[in-house]
Structures are given as structure tokens and as C-alpha cells.
Regions:
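CBM-like, beta-strand-rich accessory domains located in the C-terminal region of large
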Residues: 1-153
Length: 153
């Protein structure tokens, strides 16, 4: 008895907020995997932050917030630009123990300018079978993101 539900919000055509929900009574470990571009990474395992550090005016900031204790781990990652030739690339996973209660994570993917400092917070306001409400703050700008399925039974 396990359901994975993912909601993707594209906020103001600027950044993505992804909400992953692991629902049901199944037990084990919930893993969110991130395969990234083959560039240098700056990783903060305590805050669950991954930043690309490319020789570019723009990079990617990724942070995952969870309702439960989570662990950010480096893992093996590969990519291929040519058939039958694979090369290593950075890959990470967020790992969370799953019991009977739901596990929910909120991930920000934000295009970051050089020398930016991104501040991100997220809170699940409501979540059930028919609705999701999440409140996020990115660099002090608050947004309420939600969906609601109305059923006529």
C-alpha cells in the first residue's frame, strides 16, 4: 500500500517548487534522486542544499525541506553524450525513513546568479487526498501554492 504523488509548481516563470508525497502504510526508505550536470558542486548536507558552481553567470540552487528527518547523500551518477560511452556526473539523493504516516518533501530548484544567496523556507499547510497547500518563501517573497480536486460523488 504505497502511492507516490508529485506536484510541480512553476512559480512566476522564475523557479520550480516540487512537492513529493509518499503516502500509504508501506515501510522502508523514501529516496529522491537528483542527477546533475557534470560541473563542480557546492553541497551542504546539513541544510540539504546543492549548488552548481559552473564557469557561468548562472547556476542552479536546489534545496529540499522535509516534514521528517532527511539525509542528503552523494551517489553514483552517469551520463552519456555518445552511444556506449558513459561518463561520471554528480548525483545525490535525499533519503527519509517511511513508516505508516505520510512523508512529504518540498524541493526548490532556482536559477541562481553568481554571488547570490538564496534563502528558502517551506511549510505544508494542508495535505490530503483531494488537496495540497504549501507556503514557501524565497528570498523573503512568500507564496501560497495549492491545488484542489473537487469530486462530485
Amino acid at each position: 500500500d504505497f502511492t507516490h504523488r508529485r506536484t510541480v509548481f512553476f512559480v512566476d516563470q522564475k523557479y520550480f517548487v516540487i512537492v513529493d508525497e509518499a503516502l500509504g502504510k508501506a515501510e522502508g526508505t523514501v529516496n529522491l534522486h537528483f542527477g546533475l550536470a557534470p560541473v563542480k558542486m557546492d553541497v551542504d548536507t546539513d541544510k540539504h542544499i546543492i549548488r552548481t558552481v559552473a564557469n557561468s553567470p548562472r547556476n542552479i540552487f536546489l534545496q529540499c525541506v522535509s516534514t521528517d528527518k532527511a539525509e542528503l547523500k552523494e551517489e553514483e551518477g552517469w551520463f552519456s553524450e555518445v552511444y556506449r560511452k558513459k561518463e561520471k556526473r554528480p548525483a545525490y539523493s535525499i533519503n527519509i525513513a517511511k513508516g505508516e504516516k505520510p512523508v512529504r518533501t518540498v524541493t526548490l530548484i532556482y536559477p541562481e546568479k553568481k554571488d547570490d544567496t538564496v534563502k528558502f523556507t517551506a511549510k505544508i499547510v494542508k495535505a490530503d487526498d483531494n488537496r495540497l497547500e504549501v507556503r514557501v518563501s524565497v528570498n523573503g517573497e512568500k507564496k501560497d501554492l495549492k491545488w484542489n480536486i473537487t469530486t462530485n460523488q
